[in-house]
Amino acid sequence: MLKILYAASNNENAKIQLARFMKVMEGKPYIVKVAAYLKSSPKGQSIDWTLDALLNIFRPEVLTTESDAFNTYYDQVKYYNPDLVISDLEHFTSQVANLLNTTLWQCSSSLLNFAIEQKYNVGLFSKYSYLMNKNNASRTQRQINILENSNYNFVYSHLGDTTSPPSLKNNYDWIRPYHTIGKDSVPCRHNVMAGTLTNNRKILSLLKKYGDSVIFTEHPYEQQSGLWLKDIQNQEEYFCNLKNCNLFVCEGQTSFLADAFYNGKYSLTMTNFQDLECVMNSIFSEHIKLSSMLYQTEDTLESFLGQTVASSYNEKIRYIHEWIEEI
């Protein structure tokens, strides 16, 4: 039986991506173990290795393999002896895979930063050069080294399914994000809908100004006057509400923007500028007119209500499990 190690990166989209991957893996003839950070660990998901233990407490941005914790992780992965490592551009697990000469696939939306050929005319660098460079050249070079030593580099993004997808460099492939098409339903019809994992205060404040608005969140029991908060773990209700809303709002996570695209909904992003992936997604999505970036809660939404996008599928693009099935 094929043994897989899936390693989630240290960001919020990695949590959504991991949860949906594991859902698809249910009942398949594979053994799957998971390495993840606290930030990327879905509720109720069994985590075999919590990667926060490998971080420097005082300088978490400094990633080093010269530690007892890393050596222990290496030994345990070696004992598990996976046939395939799937990494969401996760540094430590990628290093272990290379040391063990294990087949390594990168599957991450963060690969947008490396894979797209023409990325200098979308405003990403002119407007956000500080964010792009604040983690310094060593971090970027570290990621490039990982990509050069991976067997496949999959760009996890719905942009590959658009009618005119951005061109990718050699050695990169699009991978389709997991999603569901919601059903048309009168009870699911609401005005504005938002998806957020952390109860983003700006999004909460914005939606309070618009009647019949609903927020899907990991913290649905927090009391918010004038808002409906629902559990994002209920994916059936989440996608039903998304399919039938007038407008979708999020922070720019890949999975949320992909959900809106495949359900034909226009998006607004109140971008999380602490997360480079959210910034990249927001910029590229706005550039190809799938969404708009909103900066202030005082901005109005009336001109965006009811806008739609043309969802599409590129027959050449597959889901990650379809690649696994070919092994």
Predicted regions and their residues:
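Glycosyltransferase specificity loop/lid
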Residues: M1-N81
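Active-site donor-nucleotide binding/catalytic segment of nucleotide-sugar enzymes
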Residues: L5-L18, F125-S126, L131, S157-D161, ...
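Catalytic donor nucleotide-activated moiety binding site of glycosyltransferases and closely related
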Residues: Y37-K43, I47-W49, A53-N56, L197, ...
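Donor nucleotide-activated moiety binding/catalytic core segment of transferases
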Residues: T65-D75, H219-Y262
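Conserved nucleotide-sugar donor-interacting segment of glycosyltransferase catalytic cores
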Residues: D68-Y128
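A donor-sugar binding/catalytic signature common to diverse glycosyltransferases
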Residues: V85-L89, F114, Y238-N281
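Active-site-proximal region of nucleotide-activated glycan assembly enzymes
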Residues: T103-D173
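Leloir-type glycosyltransferase catalytic cores
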Residues: S129-Y152, H287-I327
